[in-house]
């Protein structure tokens, strides 16, 4: 545990060093670092002049011994400019078709290719093999290439019918970048005189070749718990149900899982957590519209299912239903009842007030509020004699709504259990009771259910706290989870405190 915590601290410090002097690029640097540490590819989408190339150059400094290669593609770019020129001597003396790869992509650990979609088929096909297999065919031999990170950039997406989908699908992380927005960051950008060639990473933080190779093996041992799989599968089902959702290949899901494993590993954990799954927002989108869609679906996932928020609210609803049923039963026992008497002037029955009523006016409380005469009413004030007359003879009965203002016409009735009730304009009724009978103590069975919900919520909050910090997930996404858990807590508290 101490080793994993130390690694997480080291990677955090390494990331902060790489971020120095780059403004509003924290998330991009961190995800590019994660991609480099796990051997993945990144696509940066955005207008020219927003530090896309500088991000790639910075990542070279994350490694103790790393060569970098960068190239700006045009329609006229040739394979020789990317993969190295042909050896004239080998061709002349031995008849071998061999490239001189020193200083070119086949011998670079960090690769940056700008305006990637302008490259021709010869370059793109060779590049596809390099990404897939990390191998480069050079004449009669096939060599392993050391590429740890490919950063491809463009200010546009690949054309739908341009034959570029296979390469685009290999770029696991996709990031949209824009110009610096905040005033202070823009000022700092203008006055910053540091050189792009300066290495901001202390030697003790940079990654050795041996460490990198060992970490690739360690990442494979990070477990996907059943709960984590269920979250990923739920997201997949959510997306499959949407017509406008992008096509996501099984290969992309598989590669995305390894990225989640790497996130957990470099944050000092041995299993994938719901926090790591947030990274899927940068792996599954295809264009601007699906970026918004993926983020929305992922937000629903983490705020409803990641820490059992929806399940807790559903169970709270069940407890509240049970509580309401109990309160209805108790209210009926405590309802204001009248006494049935015989026939009177052609009416089948008439009623009388109980002899225990000795006040001139009655305050009667509604079992549940109703909208009467456009206001929400919780209780009534009715003249005793007027009520007695209505019980005897029927007709109109009036009372003060909530005990204030002029008297208003009331639609009272006596139900078949001889309880006095009131109806609204839609004929929804509420039983009336005397105020001293209003409070109904809840049985232990129901209060225990509320306590269980509180305990389960505390456990989910403990897990959420345990799953942090996560270097590669923006704080605003963690805040969404915290807000959803707080909402659950507030709803439980409101339910416990309601009358």
UniProtKB/Swiss-Prot annotation:
Gene Ontology MF, one: ATP hydrolysis activity
Catalyzed chemical reaction(s): ATP + H2O = ADP + phosphate + H(+)
Residues that hold ADP according to the record: 23, 49-54, 196
Alphabetical list of HAMAP family matching this protein: ATPase_RavA
Origin: domain of life: Bacteria
Record SUPFAM superfamilies: P-loop containing nucleoside triphosphate hydrolases
Complex formation: Homohexamer. Interacts with ViaA.
Pfam families: AAA_lid_8, ATPase_RavA_C, bpMoxR, LARA_dom
Protein name: Regulatory ATPase RavA
Enzyme class: hydrolase
Main location group: cytoplasm
Task performed by this protein: Component of the RavA-ViaA chaperone complex, which may act on the membrane to optimize the function of some of the respiratory chains. RavA functions as an ATPase.
Family annotation (NCBIfam families): PRK13531.1
GO CC terms: cytoplasm
